[in-house]
Amino acid sequence: MKKILLCGVFLSIISSCQVKTSKSDIPTIIPTNNTTNEPSRVEPSPVETVKAAQFGIIFSGGGVRTWAYVNILKEIQKYKLPVTSVVGIEWGAIVAGVYAQNVSANEVEWELSKFKGIDDWSNYIKKIFEKKSTAALKIPFGCMSLNLKNQTSYVLNKGQLDALIPYCISAPGMLKPFSDSIASMSDVAGAVQFLKASGATKIILLNVNPARNGKPLSQSLQSLENQFWIQSNSVLTKKNNGIDEVIDIDISAAITADKFDQRRDVLNSSLPQAKDQLKKMASKYGY
């Protein structure tokens, strides 16, 4: 059972209230080749009378691939889909944090344009989130963090953003653990619980990891980085985890997660896919 815990000082930096989830909370995943075990993709369907639906968004990880979220958010803004809360995983936590401030796709694009390179990630986060508190956000925000010492997953959702987010973005191949914490990639139940507790009635997963289609994020299946992405993606896209819609953006396998110099290519290649899939989803929900 999920528990909402009030926490005191989190690692001497974060004074926050967190949704804590233990290993036993993570859904059991039964391997199968049956595609009916996955969330339905956005397909044309009769218009549902659910225009009052309130959407919670999970921004999955993917390093530079998360720049594709700019185009998705612009389409969400275009169709005026009501977003009530957001959760970010790995680099998706940065996008979610910026978006939660003013629910603006243009602001996300502007802040991402300030990124110089992975070696400057710490200064970048301090710069764009300086003096930004979760209490001042327009919609609730959380990011997924796994503490390696106590093997516990948290939804960090209270405190200063520049202090919270570093605990949520480390991943193999790019960043070392931050204060014994890395991005929690598999605790979908914790993310869904937080979004629903924040008022969401429909959960959307934004996925820029094409490993599910046999196109890994790195060139070799033997790499630990690629094994990490495939494992996390296999959990994210299962139907039994409470996700209602999945927006898949298929980006060239040549653009690996750590190739931040290819941000423009990600933006260009994701635009038509974002337009097509969001048009279908908006129609499905009556927008």
Which sequence ranges carry the predicted segments?
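Sec-dependent N-terminal signal peptides
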Residues: 4-13
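Patatin-like phospholipase
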Residues: 17-89, 98-287
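Catalytic nucleophile loop
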Residues: 92-93
